[in-house]
């Protein structure tokens, strides 16, 4: 074995996994992709036991060389399409943001979403890993008002399974192309 200076190695700490449930989140960045008619939303847990969770995950991934500086951990990202058929869902997102930020009215400028609070409900979803095995990840199931999250007035839906695994009819599409964000260490809603 090679000689390692153990005084220079930080011991691993217990890993906290973000559980399914509802969270008060802060929007860190919203980037428009006009050609695809969608917003890339980068968010962070803003309150409670898991406040700052995605920042911690991002720092850990950068430290281990699995993410480039300035990028945001994949789990703290979601896409909201504003294509014609998706407008009711986009409207639901905007309504949740407006209800969560008294006096705020969305004016079709995605940059105004930065620093706004919104309720996020996470659920588990199965996907096919590169190794051919079915894996599970957390995804944003829906957005709601922060008041509903704080009062517990939301429901976590059951895990979404792959077709064939339980006959759900679900098929996965890849949405892993997100923009790099600049990070000065602060969150816009702190």
Question: Where is each model-derived feature located?
Answer:
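Short beta-rich binding modules
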Residues: 1-190
